């Protein structure tokens, strides 16, 4: 099978950018079984309700859903199992510090295959937005749409 030369997005967490203020992002690898990779290659995954947590000095992706591979029979994986994230020790220490000291959270933004065909997760260090911040974001979005519409009508 020929490898793709471009990045293929499998799952996108668009709600995270609305609900959280993204401070920093980094790329992490995932420990996956064979049937999970096959299911991801078909484009099946959901990271909307997932988050990352530090447990025992390691970082885990919790509550992500990768459905069973239809041809996997008895070797199939559990769809909502915890998945270990592959990061350097320096990155793990920085994430653990941000979560514990600064009260931030780790939110997955995007699950994709890189140009070498390896599954990667774009992980964000984020701070939760308050309700008034979310309303302000909606107002800004509506105003920018209105501006674009007005400019299109005039010019």
UniProtKB/Swiss-Prot annotation:
Q: Which GO terms describe its molecular function?
A: RNA binding
Keywords of the record: Cytoplasm, RNA-binding
Q: Where in the cell is it found?
A: Cytoplasm
Under the heading InterPro entries, the entry gives: SmpB, SsrA-bd_prot, SsrA-bd_prot_CS
| Subcellular location, principal | cytoplasm
Report one GO cellular component: cytosol
The UniProt record lists the keyword Iron-sulfur: no
Q: What's one GO BP annotation on this UniProt entry?
A: trans-translation
Protein function: Required for rescue of stalled ribosomes mediated by trans-translation. Binds to transfer-messenger RNA (tmRNA), required for stable association of tmRNA with ribosomes. tmRNA and SmpB together mimic tRNA shape, replacing the anticodon stem-loop with SmpB. tmRNA is encoded by the ssrA gene; the 2 termini fold to resemble tRNA(Ala) and it encodes a 'tag peptide', a short internal open reading frame. During trans-translation Ala-aminoacylated tmRNA acts like a tRNA, entering the A-site of stalled ribosomes, displacing the stalled mRNA.
Q: What does the similarity note say?
A: Belongs to the SmpB family.
What protein name is recorded for this chain? SsrA-binding protein
State the organism of origin: Chelativorans sp. (strain BNC1)
